[in-house]
Amino acid sequence: QRSSAASDVYKRQVLEALNININFEPKDIERQINENNFGFMFAPNYHSAMKFVGPTRKKIGKRTIFNMIGPLSSPALVKRQVVGVFENKLLKIFANALNNLDIKFAWIVNSEDGLDEISPYAKTNVIQLKDNKISEITIDPKELNINADKFENIIGNDAKFNADKLINIFKGEDNDFSKAVCLNAAAGLIVSEKYDDFKLAYNHSRDFINSG
């Protein structure tokens, strides 16, 4: 199975390659979110338990229970989430767990080509948790007129390569990277209740990026 979700370490390296400081106090992150609608929380800086298990997880080199605990134990106590899982059978398990944590609105996603996010190449199975109610959704890129080429096109590389790709996305470059980003950004717009129609949310993401 494939997992396209980079670890927090890889995300950190990309942001550092862009000369973006990630070492902020919680109050600074709160201010950034209020001012810019965006904040990056590097997990080891805020979640002491995960900080100490990180080296052990790296040595094991395989998926463990910690791959599932992470999204369920966020110290930020957010009420809206988009969560990717690495197996389809985990969708409802996560939905029930998040419901027990009083999450208001969440999408739990797993694509049929093995990604733990919404795929531009294959259908993605989604369990929606909203106000204690669980429902099933399928996202089909063909219905969105997405003509993505092949999975290998979104495989990352070193931090500089990934940072350059990220910059190109924000410059409006139309490729499989940007399609994947817009699909998953659309999920964020849904759980934040900016949109209730996924196609409209996706088109908004595309228009926003294309506008520069």
Describe the predicted segments one by one.
Residues 16-23, 28-212:
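Glycine-rich anion-binding loops and their surrounding alpha/beta cores
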Residues 1-6, 10:
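Single conserved hydrophobic/aromatic residue that forms the stacking wall/gate
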Residues 13:
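N-terminal glycine-rich flavin-associated loop
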